[in-house]
Amino acid sequence: PVDPGRGAVAGHFHRKADFSADQTGLDLADCLPAGQKAYVAAPMRWCGVMLALKDRLPGLHPYCARVICSSYLPDWRPGVDYRTVYSAHKAMGGGVTIDLIHEWDYLVELFGVPEQLYNFKGTYSDLEIDSDDLSVYIARYPTLLAEVHLDYFGRGYRRSIELFCHDGSYLADFGAGTLTLPDGTVQHYEEDVNRRYEREMEYFVDYALTGSGESCNPPALALNVLKLTLGENVQ
């Protein structure tokens, strides 16, 4: 049976959020019994344009990946003073670095854990917040470099990944739901935002009832994503 309150199927667990920033030293053996199935939510992996990009990835061999998530924090929650929400306050777990963990989650899904990572972050805009509003990363993989830009102060919503390849660039625009190919062709994957969550739950229920081994996003991998998001190198 499914327990919607706990996100569980027959004793198997779907964690709805990532680990908190102070849990990077967590010993997972203390949290899960041996053989326990577990899956940490990663909704951007399940959106239509991401699935389309992932299908093409084996033949692309990109030299570089450029990732951006830029938006204006005061517009996140219409009718709510942005200065009062957790995002604005470091002590409440806010800051663009941890708020936008999904970018590192899908990068790890596409390319794995980088060999080396550098991260610079801080508060640079005139927003009335004490959390970081800008976080920039450079990551080195065996065959490519990745650039990641996260901010709270961009006017207009931009969320995309661009892959630079031998035949040109491929741009997956998550806001528009489109994939632009090197020849200018635009493929459309617009869909209701809830569709990604439906796909994710379909996977989880199937895994819980019939799957074996680790899930596609086990807690150990999610913990590594958290470490990368915080700018830590993962061995």
Report the location of each language-model feature.
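C-terminal helix-rich "cap/oligomerization" subdomain common to oxidoreductases
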Residues: G5-G7, Y203-Q235
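Active-site loop of classical SDR/Rossmann-like NAD(P)-dependent oxidoreductases
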Residues: E190-E202, N217
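Contiguous beta-strand/loop segments that form the cofactor/metal-binding neighborhood of enzyme cores
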Residues: I98, W104-A176, M201-S212
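Predominantly a Rossmann-like dinucleotide-binding segment in NAD(P)-dependent oxidoreductases
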Residues: C47-Y118, S125
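A short glycine-threonine-serine/GTX helix/turn-capping micro-motif
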Residues: A91-I98, Q187-R195
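Short, surface-exposed beta-strand-loop junctions and turns on beta-sheet-rich folds
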Residues: F153-R155, T178-T180, T185-Q187
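A general structural signal for well-ordered alpha-helical segments in protein cores
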Residues: V49-M50, E103-L107, E198-V205, L226-T229
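Beta-strand-loop-alpha-helix segment that lines the small-molecule cofactor/substrate pocket
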Residues: P1-R45
